[in-house]
Amino acid sequence: MDRRSFLSLAAALPALSAFAQGATTPAFAKLPIGGMDKKLTPAFAAAGYGYLELFITAEIVPGKEDDVFAKNLAALKALPIPTTFLNGFITSDIPMVGPDAQHDKVEKWVRTAFPRAQKLGVGVVTVGSGGSRRCPKGFEPAKAREQFSKILGRIAPIARDHGIRLTIENLNTAETNLCTSIAESVEVITAAGPDVFLTADLYHMMRDNDPAEELRKAKGRLIHCHVAEKELRSAPGTKGDDFRPHLRVLREMGYAGAFSFECGWAKSVSPDKAIAAFRQQLATL
């Protein structure tokens, strides 16, 4: 090896070492970030948020007539950033599990909701709906999981036909009793079929002490993440929570989805400060 080659190799070694240790790639550090508070849309847009994630029940209003949705659609289209994600999914009076599960009503709901979501330009719908999916007392949890998988598998092709990927999210045990961990959520979506995916909610994981390493179980099915700090469900940068244990696992998995801030907003932390704090963590893994 001549001297020039040796010097070139020596100069490259720090970068190669960082890569071997899993240094953050520019692409991962720049993954899209969105907000969930419509009132803050101008601030989101100014701070570089790429999209809004809003609630189906509030914006798509499947239980109301087309003219109501048309007004919402026009207002949403006029906002400075697009609404490309939706969550919430369905009201608690239409149960997806239990002895009174109403799967026909769920399908009727989505046959209104998904075409409307497509008109808005939505690409991902997340099923939270802790009330609708709550396993009733005395009902077998395994049967509830089976029912949940069944209805997800039934409506996922309808979502796909409208250009939408259907996901479920893990919720903590204070909000529901079904799919409260990444592992249980993966079990349900696997049984539901290949058209159902996962939204990993890092806040809910932290509330229930679900380890970051559990995310690896969702490889190939994880397409979206929700983010908030653990104690008060506050925006990143409020208390200073460290999301990097989760972010490292996501990076190592090759995660290429987005991050939605599903959080409250303290006066001390504006959208620009929150996105800067989170981007800093993305860039320093």
Feature-to-residue mapping (PLM):
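Histidine-acidic metal/acid-base catalytic patches
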Residues: R3-P32, K38-A47, G121, C179-L285
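Active-site acidic/histidine proton-transfer and metal-coordination neighborhood
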Residues: A10-A23, P95-F197
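Short amphipathic alpha-helices and their capping/turn segments at secondary-structure boundaries
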Residues: T41-P42, E65-P80, W109-G121, G153-P157, ...
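N-terminal substrate-binding region of glycoside hydrolase catalytic domains
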Residues: A47-D66, N87-D93
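Mid-chain, structured segments of secreted extracytoplasmic proteins
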Residues: N72, A78-H103
